[in-house]
């Protein structure tokens, strides 16, 4: 999942840059949305990992 979130962020960055260079506001906005989606996935994954770690520590 971490790879997917990083890929979404990378893809979004590329789209945003290309949109900016070509003055394509729609592509630029799409890139911003992809980056935000990737970041959200990363935050959720990190939270899940922290919760899992906390549960594992409580079990010991």
UniProtKB/Swiss-Prot annotation:
Start and end residues of each stretch annotated as Disordered: 18-41
Annotated source species: Staphylococcus aureus (strain NCTC 8325 / PS 47)
InterPro entries with a match to the protein in the record: CsbD, UPF0337_stress_rsp, YjbJ_sf
Sequence ranges of Basic and acidic residues compositional bias: 23-41
Coiled coil start-end: none
Family: Belongs to the UPF0337 (CsbD) family.
Pfam families found in the cross-reference section: CsbD (PF05532)
Name of the protein this chain belongs to: UPF0337 protein SAOUHSC_01730
